[in-house]
Amino acid sequence: LSRGLGDVYKRQIPYAVADFAEMRERGFYYVDKTNYIPGLEDYNAPIFLRPRRFGKSLLISMLAHYYDRTKANRFEELFGGTWIGEHPTEEHNQYLVIRYDFSAMVMADDMEGVVQNFNDLNCGPVEVTVEHNRDLFGDFQFTTRGNAVQMLEELLGYISSHGLPKAYILIDEYDNFTNQLLTSYNDSLYEEVTTSDSFLLTFFKVIKAGIGEGTIRTCFCTGVLPVIMDDLTSGYNIAEILTFKPVFLNMLGFTYEETKTYLRYVLDKYAPGASEERFEEIWQLIVNNYDGYRFSPVGERLFNSTILTYFLKKFAANAGSIPPELIDENLRTDINWIRRLTLSQNNAKETVSYTHLRAHETRGNL
């Protein structure tokens, strides 16, 4: 919750803040999820799935700052006052972080265009890693440019041959652009993208080989649906989906306890003097409007962190008055997106996977 500086001022409510460093530097209220880091270190190829707007990008950013060797001098600044700041693992700030963001992928109408857009987006992350770690890479320059797979291979080869620290790969929204193909009714192109010799399968084959050879410590992926990994199993059969594992159920989203603590903070700072009756009134409104996620029969109820934070930010801005709009229109579920994934004859697997993912949701107003 704190940055180790004491809670002596009003912390801002961090609506739509996905950068961990910004979260800490600007003193935003942070619901601490760093206690899940040690458990994640038991896996080499974990995948964690949650619905849209559930805090996945902030989790990716937090892990990037934790493992990046170039951020070692900022460890106390960024993690002071958090659980992991008090219980750091031996692996903190030990790796060459390579961070991909597939949510920024631009679609195309044919395979050639998709490949080009994939390369345009994903050549940059390895170049950034080299530049940020120039003290290790010296005068190294890529011999191949414009091909994301080959550049990743070349980087891993250099790591291996020069005994450099391992890479730690993070992929945010790994299924975003393939989901776009499905929702745009481009099934034939989707099939091309996920075939055995496609650029995407080759990309994950390189990662699998790197994990096996010891040049990659971990490849952590977030996404919404498991279907893409189902279709890529021949090339990436080491993936471990953590979505429904009991120990990780609360890694994203806010529990009742976390939400009550958050609400009490907002009332104390932005509506001082609010009575317990006022707390109970607002709490009941929150439960009635935002309660709706349970990812296991034995799991706790969870709130969507982005939707809840939207309400609390508006509530704070109104000095403790209930805002007229309880949900940001930009966050309402894209019904066409769900309909496309669940009604297409050719996407039966998507139907099963998506239904399973949301099987234990209750009545959230998304």
Model-found features: residue ranges?
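Walker A/P-loop-proximal flanking segment of P-loop NTPase domains
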Residues: K10-R53, L58-Y67, E76-I84
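Conserved P-loop NTPase mechanochemical-coupling segment
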Residues: A16-V17, M105-A148, T178-Y190
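P-loop NTPase motor core
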Residues: F79-P125
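Substrate-engagement module of ASCE P-loop NTPases
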Residues: Y158-S160, Y190-I216
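Structural recognition of the conserved hydrophobic beta-strand(s) that form the central parallel beta-sheet
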Residues: L170, R217-V224
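Amphipathic alpha-helical segments of the small helical/lid subdomains adjacent to P-loop NTPase cores
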Residues: I228-S234, L242-F311
